[in-house]
Amino acid sequence: VYGMLFKFL
């Protein structure tokens, strides 16, 4: 889940 959020940043 966190990976997706980081990719968005």
UniProtKB/Swiss-Prot annotation:
The keyword Secreted applies. It is found in: Secreted. Expressed by the venom gland. GO terms for molecular function: toxin activity. The keyword Cell division does not apply. Signal peptide: none annotated. GO terms for cellular component: extracellular region. Keywords: Secreted, Toxin. Belongs to the cationic peptide 04 (cupiennin) family. 08 subfamily. This is Short cationic peptide-4f.
